[in-house]
Amino acid sequence: MAKASRDTLYAPLRLPRVYNLLQSLTGGSRDRADFVKRHVLFRSDEKVVDAGCGTGSALEFLPPVKYVGFDPNSGYIHAAQSRYGSRGQFLCGDADSSEVWELVQSADTFLSFGVLHHLTDSQIRKILSLAQRCLRQSGRFIFYEPCFSARDDVLGRICMNLDRGGNIKTDQAWRALLSEYFATLEEHLRRPVYWFRYTIQAFICRDPRQL
């Protein structure tokens, strides 16, 4: 699908209420919550950065932590502040923002839940570089994205080709990209996920590579 057509079709999802409704209907938040519950432990004093936090829905399943979320959509950030303002800090901006850079320093965990496939390759690398530079050496990058793989559900592959984000990669491509920034990758493939039967590739990435 051409980018202009995709942007027009999915324009309503830029509205926080529409976005939240779709997440609820498709079960996206439920699978993310299940992945975190099974594989990711948090300390109460941990600084957690949510890159592309959207409306802050990750706070529905995160335990109490020192939460920082950023997103370039001002409507999403306003909705997040209205609902979760007492539980963390929210900033409207992207990986190029100096304010974001200052706020995310010395993070223990970076989260990227279904964000990167909505970005260009250049923007994806900026997010990964931000995490690489701002994580503590003992920190981790939590990656959760749809991917194309050899065992995709037929409906899932069709839906992924029609996804709002136009940059879904193969499992090999995501793995190779992440390995440029992190030395240790713990991988979890989840399929089929959501009503749309996506294949989801999740990683817990550790040991940021030294620049």
Language-model features: locations:
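A conserved beta-strand element that flanks and buttresses the S-adenosyl-L-methionine
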Residues: 111
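Hydrophobic adenine-recognition pocket in adenosine-nucleotide-binding enzymes
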Residues: 115
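Class I (Rossmann-like) S-adenosyl-L-methionine-dependent methyltransferase catalytic domain
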Residues: 1-47, 54-102, 119-126, 130, ...
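Short, surface-exposed basic-aromatic patches at helix termini and helix-loop junctions that form
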Residues: 133
